[in-house]
């Protein structure tokens, strides 16, 4: 039989061990919450990029693709290329999304795009970090102010991607008129909108091509189509789209020059 003093010491020891365990549990819980908060606001982004040719894809890799957390390139020779009608895009996006299911990756957000885009990735990630990826959230990025046909970009939260996998066979129909109608029907919920700013200006800039160099000279009134088109777009762009090979060669250089000049100007204001 244990002496009273021994029982007291054993009880004191158990009390202290229990207290330490509770403290460890609380510390672990706080650490988990901190990590969860950090993980939510430091958004991870996985990109599935459809190649239209090695030159275009390599230019994307050397510029904006390096800024996403990870990416997978669908080779251009895997695609049955034809005129990109909405029905063709629906079919192809469906294949891209389902193929991503086989890839060994874990991310909060998944983007599906062609290589004729240039993204301001940091700005996009900051925008996505406002939303909880545990909810079935998705968005469709397209320049709705452009009167030209161009390929959209799709972005899914992890939860939305799983929802698509679950509902794809039952809900999705490739007979929809456009990608927006197809995906909204598939998901059974509307997308969020991040492609326009508060002034309803587009944050996606689709590059337009002119038919002739001197077309403005034929106009009776002073008018500049390019200037008007630019002003219809937001000052906080998320991307340029409908880019040519030459566009992709030049655009990163222009962006670097503009951002470099802005940073120098900001630094000089701080110093002086």
From Swiss-Prot:
Stretch forming the signal peptide: 1-20
Keyword line:
Signal
GO molecular function, one example?
glycoprotein-N-acetylgalactosamine 3-beta-galactosyltransferase activity
Q: In its UniProt entry, what is this protein called?
A: Uncharacterized protein F37A4.3
Q: Which organism is it from?
A: Caenorhabditis elegans
């Amino acid at each position: 039989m244990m002496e009273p003093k021994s029982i007291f010491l054993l009880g004191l020891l158990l009390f202290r061990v229990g207290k330490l365990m509770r403290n460890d549990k609380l510390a672990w819980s706080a650490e988990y919450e901190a990590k969860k908060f950090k993980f939510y606001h430091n958004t991870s982004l996985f990109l599935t990029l459809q190649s239209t040719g090695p030159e275009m894809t390599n230019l994307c890799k050397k510029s904006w693709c390096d800024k996403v957390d990870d990416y997978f390139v669908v080779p251009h020779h895997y695609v049955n290329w034809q005129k990109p009608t909405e029905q063709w895009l629906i079919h192809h996006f469906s294949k891209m999304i389902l193929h991503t299911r086989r890839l060994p990756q874990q991310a909060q957000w998944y983007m599906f795009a062609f290589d004729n885009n240039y993204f301001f990735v940091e700005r996009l990630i900051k925008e996505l970090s406002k939303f909880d990826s545990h909810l079935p959230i998705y968005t469709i990025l397209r320049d709705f102010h452009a009167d030209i046909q161009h390929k959209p970009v799709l972005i899914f939260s992890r939860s939305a991607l799983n929802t698509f996998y679950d509902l794809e066979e039952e809900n999705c129909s490739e007979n929809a008129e456009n990608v927006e109608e197809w995906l909204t029907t598939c998901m059974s919920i509307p997308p969020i909108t991040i492609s326009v700013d508060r002034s309803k200006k587009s944050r996606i800039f689709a590059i337009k091509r002119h038919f002739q160099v001197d077309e403005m000279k034929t106009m009776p009134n002073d008018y500049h189509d390019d200037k008007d088109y630019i002003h219809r777009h937001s000052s906080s762009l998320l991307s340029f789209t409908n880019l040519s090979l030459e566009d992709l060669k030049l655009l990163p250089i222009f962006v670097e020059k503009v951002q470099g000049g802005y940073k120098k100007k900001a630094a000089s204001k701080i110093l002086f």
